[in-house]
Structures are given as C-alpha cells and as structure tokens.
C-alpha cells in the first residue's frame, strides 16, 4: 500500500510531515547531541559567514543529491542568505518526475504554512500604524467570533490568533475545508469544538484562526482581502514580482514545479488541486521561488527594512513575532508564525509548510543575519526541514543531527500505525445493513447531510459542498469513511491516498434507536455527531 499522510497534516507548518512528534524527536536528538558532544565548534564570526557558506557548498550539494535519491525527491531549490545578499542559490532535479525541465532558482513552489510568517508581519505592520493592537479582543473586532467557552471568547486576543495555544484539538475542523466548506463556515464552526486543554497552556497546531487573522488584518487596513495587504505591504516593496497566491497564477507560470507525494515505491505525481491550499488563505496560500524568498528573508534579518533602507515594519513589532508564546517541547517554542529552537550557537527561528505535493522551509539565525530557504516538489518526508536545519547547524558549528533519517523513520512508523489501525479484523463481526438507516442528518459544524444508498453502497453526502464519504463495513457496527473521488474532490481524494478519513458508527438513543452517526477522524480523533432529523 502506498505511503501517504493524513488529511489534517497536509497544511500543518510543523514539518513537511506536518507531525509535531517528528519534530519532537529531532529536538530530543539535538538536545542529546548537544549534551554529549565534547564541545561545539567555534562560533563563526560575522565576517566569515560568506566564506563558511562557500566552503560548505561541496558537502551541501553532496548531501542534497544523496538525500534526494534516498527519498526520490524529483526537484528541490535552496538559497542561503547572509544579510541582504543571496550568497548561494541552486536548483536540483526536475520540475516534474520523468520530465526534462530543470528546477532553478526562479521555479515556483507552493510554500504552505511558511505563509504564516507573512501573516504575522502584516499584523505587525497594522500594529505599527495603530490600526490593530496585539492585545485587542477579537470580539471587539469581529462580534460574530465565538468559542465554546464564553470566557475564552471574551479573552481571545489578536496575538492568540497565531500563537497555536487555543485549547482546541490539533488541526481543529480543518477537515471542513478539505470537504469543501467555505472559510466563513469554518470560522463559525469553532464555537462547536470542545477544548482538549486549558486556554494558552498547550501547543496545538491549527489553521482556521489564521484565516480569521487574515480577515481582521484586511479589515483594519481597509483592503479587499488579506492577499491585497500582502501584495501592497510586502510583495511590492520588496520587489517579489514572481510571488503569487492563487491556483491560476501558479499554473499560468511557465516555470512552476509539479507536486509529488512519497510512496514506498517512489514519488508519484499528484493532481493539482484548485482549492487547496489557496482556500486556506493566510494560513498557507503563497507560491514563491528562491530568488523572491531571499528578499523576504533579508527583510527579517534586517529587522524590517529593505536593502534600500525603506522601513516596512518596526523592529520592535517584528521582533514580537519571533517571541515564544508556547512550548513545543523542552527544546523548542512556538511564536507567531515561527518556531524558535535554541541551539548551542544561537536560536534558529524557522517555519515550514506542507501542501499536496510540496514542502518548504525557511530558517533564520537573526544574530548572525543568516537565513536558509528550501523548496521542494515532494511532500510528506520532511527533506526541506531536515536540510534547512542541517545547513544552519553546519554554518553555526552546532553538533550534527541526522534530521533526514529521524523524520523519515518517524514518517514510516506513523504510516504503519495508521495502516494497523484501519486494517479490518481477520474475523470481523457482521455489519448491519445501512439501507434502513438512510435519511437526513445534521451536524452543527458541517450542517445538513444525507445518508444515501447506491445499490449496496452507502455514502454520507455533505449538503453544503457535495462531498461524499463512502461507508464500508469494518467490524460490526463500525464502518470506515472514505472520500469519494468525484468532481472537485477527485484531486483531494487522490492526494490523500487510500486510507479512510474516519471511522463511522451509529449510536443509539435511550430507546435503542440508531439516531446518531458519529465520525471519528483517523488523524487526531476529533469526532462529529450527525443526528437524524
């Protein structure tokens, strides 16, 4: 069976694997290496950074080539920035597996959740202008905003939108987007989600708050949408002329990469999805290349000014976006659109992104004004994050960690666990017929749905989007729910691979009648009750 990853992990910014446990393993490994190494290499002087970059190039290129071959990455581009200079930039491989067109430093890739740092910077710009304040209450800016807990609703502030500590489950209600519900429905759905931890205490990666954050920034700036703010406040001043944020712009480019996903048998091309990640807006909709992203990195390294001296954002509010808000582990923290990872020779501030077929990583060492960008046309195995951290560790003189092996091993283990969970028992209990249970249902987050029969096959159809989840017998009254690859969902289903999205089970009321269909997501375990109408 092909090696794939689950729905919610697709847009997480934490590893191309989009799995925080993978990163935790890497952080633990770095901690152990730091503690057991006799001593770190001498910290490089600022005047030697460019020389160190050039000296690293042969081993860097050897490392890239070996790892691309190891996990069958079709194409990749990397850039290393020192101050306002792109010191090293190169493309490797091809834009499409089996094709002849080579990747270069102008090839467009989706950057996924590396977009989130652009969002936090536009927030900082609005704060500079007094149009927003970091501690503004969200209900004062959007009276329709509501969480399950009334106290959390009142206390939720602007900085909370990006701090990944909402108290809700990881990737809360992201599944609504993959199943075609619009952004407003997703934002509204958070009022129905039960918290799993106390507000502001525990890291849990989410995307929907970033969609709302983009709307709030746009409203504060008087813009049509967040992308308009991105264009006028960051892309235009920096001259990022190749950077876009739509499916049409991506496919219109004569030099764009094609997405692939890893399988045990090698990478396979994935269908281009017109909606994802673009329908996730400020959470992950940017397309860019190495040359443009180098300009973005230079802005961060310069504390908010362009090479020409134009101030885009104040150093104070930009630094606030790099300030930790919640612990990821005992060795890493989440800020606003950035992860902050202490190392023996300085903090690395980074974020990555993963979409259907693409992975990206941006990493900064602010004290040394050093940055790395990695863009790839293969998702799910974590090469950009591993390569980015490996490169900075080498340049900073940190103890070495084999991130690529760690992330790949964890990825395979995660997949194996998923396969075991959904494998049908050898001697399953007979499943009751679903035809008598067909009818209309509703869920607060999804809205109306209908369980319909097509011959002997049952499918739950979401009225708001037309998405269909096929129910297949698993064990007794438990079924698996798999997205039917029809219409606009064909690309989504293909990208998700063969594993089901959820388990489905009918639950009886006090009179013993099956009145509720519960869907429990395979990834993360979030449950949705569809009640018979």
What residue ranges belong to the model's regions?
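Short, well-ordered beta-strand elements
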Residues: 361-364, 368-377, 517-519
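Peripheral terminal and inter-domain segments
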Residues: 39-41, 389-533
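N-terminal secretory signal peptides that target proteins for export/translocation
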Residues: 1-15
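Short, small/polar residue-rich loop motifs at catalytic or cofactor-binding pockets
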Residues: 72-75, 356-359, 445
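Short, conserved catalytic-motif segment at the N-terminal edge
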Residues: 49-111, 131-133, 140-141, 146-148, ...
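Short, surface-exposed loop or secondary-structure junction motifs
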Residues: 91-97, 150-356, 360-364, 379
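Bacterial N-terminal signal peptides
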Residues: 13-33
């Amino acid at each position: 069976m092909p090696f794939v990853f689950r729905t919610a992990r697709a847009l997480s910014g934490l590893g191309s694997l989009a799995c925080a446990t993978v990163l935790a393993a890497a952080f633990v490994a770095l901690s152990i290496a730091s503690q057991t190494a006799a001593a770190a290499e001498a910290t490089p002087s600022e005047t030697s950074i460019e020389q160190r970059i050039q000296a690293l190039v042969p081993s860097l290129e050897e490392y890239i080539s070996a790892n691309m071959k190891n996990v069958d990455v079709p194409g990749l581009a990397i850039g290393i920035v020192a101050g306002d200079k792109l010191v090293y930039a190169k493309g490797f491989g091809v834009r499409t597996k089996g094709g002849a067109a080579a990747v270069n430093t102008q090839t467009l890739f989706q950057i996924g959740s590396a977009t989130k740092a652009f969002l936090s910077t536009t927030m900082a710009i609005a704060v500079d202008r007094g149009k927003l304040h970091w501690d503004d209450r969200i209900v004062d800016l959007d009276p329709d905003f509501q969480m399950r807990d009334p106290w959390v609703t009142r206390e939720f502030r602007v900085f909370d939108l990006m701090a990944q500590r909402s108290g809700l489950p990881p990737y809360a209600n992201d599944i609504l987007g993959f199943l075609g519900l619009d952004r407003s429905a997703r934002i509204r759905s958070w009022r129905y989600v039960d918290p799993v931890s106390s507000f502001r205490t525990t890291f849990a990666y989410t995307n929907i708050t970033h969609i709302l954050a983009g709307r709030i920034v746009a409203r504060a700036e008087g813009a049509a949408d967040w992308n308009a703010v991105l264009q006028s406040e960051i892309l235009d001043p920096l001259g990022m002329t190749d950077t876009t944020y739509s499916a049409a712009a991506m496919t219109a480019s004569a030099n764009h990469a094609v997405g692939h996903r890893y399988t045990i048998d090698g990478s396979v091309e994935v269908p281009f999805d017109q909606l994802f990640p673009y329908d996730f807006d400020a959470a992950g909709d940017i397309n860019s290349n190495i040359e443009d992203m180098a300009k973005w990195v230079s802005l961060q390294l310069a504390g908010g000014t362009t090479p020409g001296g134009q101030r885009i954002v104040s150093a104070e509010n930009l630094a606030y976006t790099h300030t930790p808000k919640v612990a990821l582990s005992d060795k890493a923290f989440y800020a606003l659109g950035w992860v902050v990872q202490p190392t023996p020779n300085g903090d690395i501030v980074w974020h990555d992104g993963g979409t259907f077929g693409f992975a990206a990583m941006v990493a900064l060492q602010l004290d040394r004004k050093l940055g790395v960008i990695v863009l790839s046309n293969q998702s799910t195995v974590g090469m950009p994050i591993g390569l980015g951290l490996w490169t900075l560790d080498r340049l900073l003189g940190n103890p070495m960690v084999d991130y690529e092996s760690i992330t790949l091993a964890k990825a395979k283990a995660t997949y194996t666990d998923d396969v075991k969970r959904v494998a049908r028992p050898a001697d399953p209990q007979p499943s009751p017929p679903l035809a008598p249970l067909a009818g209309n249902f509703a869920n607060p987050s999804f809205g109306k749905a209908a369980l319909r029969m097509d011959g002997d096959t049952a499918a739950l159809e979401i009225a708001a989007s037309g998405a269909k989840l096929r129910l297949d017998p698993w064990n007794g009254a438990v079924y698996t729910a798999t997205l039917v690859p029809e219409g606009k969902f064909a690309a989504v289903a293909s990208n998700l691979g063969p594993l089901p999205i959820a388990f489905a089970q009918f639950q009886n009321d006090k009179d013993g009648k099956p009145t509720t269909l519960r869907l429990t997501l395979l990834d993360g375990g979030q449950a949705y009750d569809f009640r018979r109408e």
